[in-house]
């Protein structure tokens, strides 16, 4: 039975490109059938004049990044948005700006995943160790790599996890290849995963898993192979094919992701960040069968998710039906306050045998990482590609 919510108003802001790509007008029509009015916001004008608003859906990632680069217009837009949020704590924001900023920084999001894994203590999950490279590599860099379990081949990504440049990546096979890398960037150990990526598209408590091709397997250890530079977005398009994804044969373990594991990771991220609309890229280690989270994306494209609008409307309906919207907002942000504080605020205990504390030089920042999940290599990396819908489930 459908719930009718007459008088409720949902505002949204996203780029015209994303509006067209999602065909968001269809979502607005779906909402109106439930009595919900949908309003496209103009951030160049006072939001107060466009209210009242019960929920705001946004994709402000580009604007936030431009504001961080001191673009005056973007700074004004973000400030206007923030001012409205502070003046209207009863309005539900999908999703909170602090959470979006975390997901825009790969170093921060990888650290969050590491803490989530430590908190969950699930041996079926082990994401790659990573380093943040702040300056050009030297001999000390190689020593830190070796000391902390990062092994060739390595995957190099931009620290910023959004925008065209964020898809520019490299696979580095030897020390010589490191010299050509331009910092700042994030480095992860690559792990073979039989050229399969699982993209998890989350909408509140529901998620859909889409299977896509990924990078083929590469042998562990340094080699004289030249570095491979590529654009992961081009490799990942559903209609694309690439020699980088051509798998000659399946090697080692070939397992599909476990629903229980995905549900747990999704729930932990929702609780830690208070987010509802995000994507998780997962690969399966072909030596251990462990799940590795290799990227988290704010408000992804939801390609291959035919029921995205239905899931989104159901999620909005659920949060609007809660007794007190202000209480609801605090629950969204604080549901996992205990978990969030432990994951995001509390430094890991130095006595914890699973944690390697930061050991840095002036040029390299090594994030704390779990060791022991794979004695030979650590899982890795961000890759996507062509798609078929795999599974749909509820994360509760």
UniProtKB/Swiss-Prot annotation:
Record-listed 1D-myo-inositol 1,3,4-trisphosphate binding positions: 18, 167, 199, 297
InterPro entries found in the cross-reference section: ATP-grasp, Inositol_tetrakis-P_1-kinase, InsP(3)kin_ATP-grasp, ITPK1_N
Residues the record lists as binding Mg(2+) 2: 295, 297
Catalytic activity as recorded in UniProt: 1D-myo-inositol 3,4,5,6-tetrakisphosphate + ATP = 1D-myo-inositol 1,3,4,5,6-pentakisphosphate + ADP + H(+); 1D-myo-inositol 1,3,4-trisphosphate + ATP = 1D-myo-inositol 1,3,4,5-tetrakisphosphate + ADP + H(+); 1D-myo-inositol 1,3,4-trisphosphate + ATP = 1D-myo-inositol 1,3,4,6-tetrakisphosphate + ADP + H(+); 1D-myo-inositol 3,4,6-trisphosphate + ATP = 1D-myo-inositol 1,3,4,6-tetrakisphosphate + ADP + H(+)
Domain ATP-grasp positions: 117-325
Domain of life: Eukaryota
A Pfam match: Ins134_P3_kin_N
Chain positions recorded as Mg(2+) 1 binding sites: 281, 295
Subunit structure: Monomer.
Function: Kinase that can phosphorylate various inositol polyphosphate such as Ins(3,4,5,6)P4 or Ins(1,3,4)P3. Phosphorylates Ins(3,4,5,6)P4 at position 1 to form Ins(1,3,4,5,6)P5. This reaction is thought to have regulatory importance, since Ins(3,4,5,6)P4 is an inhibitor of plasma membrane Ca(2+)-activated Cl(-) channels, while Ins(1,3,4,5,6)P5 is not. Also phosphorylates Ins(1,3,4)P3 on O-5 and O-6 to form Ins(1,3,4,6)P4, an essential molecule in the hexakisphosphate (InsP6) pathway.
Name under which the protein is recorded: Inositol-tetrakisphosphate 1-kinase
């Amino acid at each position: 039975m459908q719930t009718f919510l007459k008088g409720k108003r949902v505002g949204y802001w996203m780029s015209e490109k994303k509006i067209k790509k999602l065909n968001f007008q269809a979502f607005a029509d779906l909402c109106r059938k439930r009595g919900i009015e949908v309003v496209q916001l103009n951030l160049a004008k006072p939001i107060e004049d466009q209210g009242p608003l019960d929920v705001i859906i946004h994709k402000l990632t580009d604007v936030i990044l431009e504001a961080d680069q001191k673009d005056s217009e973007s700074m004004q837009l973000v400030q206007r948005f923030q001012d409205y949020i502070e003046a209207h704590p009863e309005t539900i924001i999908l999703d909170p700006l602090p959470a979006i900023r975390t997901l825009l920084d790969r170093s921060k999001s990888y650290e969050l995943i590491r803490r989530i894994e430590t908190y969950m203590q699930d041996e079926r999950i082990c994401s790659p160790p990573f380093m943040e490279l702040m300056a050009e590599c030297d001999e000390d860099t190689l020593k830190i790599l070796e000391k902390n379990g990062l092994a060739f081949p390595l995957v190099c990504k931009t620290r910023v996890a959004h925008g065209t440049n964020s898809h520019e990546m490299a696979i580095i096979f030897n020390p010589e290849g490191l010299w050509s890398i331009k910092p700042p960037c994030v480095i992860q150990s690559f792990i073979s995963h039989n050229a399969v990526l699982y993209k998890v598209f989350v909408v509140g408590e529901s998620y859909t898993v889409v299977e896509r091709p990924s990078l083929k397997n590469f042998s562990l250890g340094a080699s004289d192979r030249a570095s491979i530079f590529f654009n992961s977005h081009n490799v990942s398009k559903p209609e694309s094919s690439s020699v980088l994804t051509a798998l000659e044969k399946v090697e080692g373990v070939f397992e599909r992701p476990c629903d229980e594991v995905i549900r747990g990771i999704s729930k932990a991220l929702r609780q830690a960040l208070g987010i509802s609309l995000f994507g998780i890229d997962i690969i399966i280690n072909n030596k251990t069968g462990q799940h590795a989270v290799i990227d988290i994306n704010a408000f992804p494209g939801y390609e291959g998710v035919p029921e995205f609008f239905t899931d989104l409307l159901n999620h909005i309906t659920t949060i609007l039906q809660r007794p007190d919207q202000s209480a609801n907002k605090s629950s969204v942000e604080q549901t996992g306050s205990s978990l969030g504080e432990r994951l995001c605020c509390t430094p890991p205990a130095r006595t914890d045998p699973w944690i390697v504390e930061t050991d840095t030089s002036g040029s390299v920042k090594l994030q704390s990482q779990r060791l022991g999940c794979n004695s030979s290599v650590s899982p890795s990396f961000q890759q996507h590609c062509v798609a078929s819908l795999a599974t749909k489930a509820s994360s509760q």
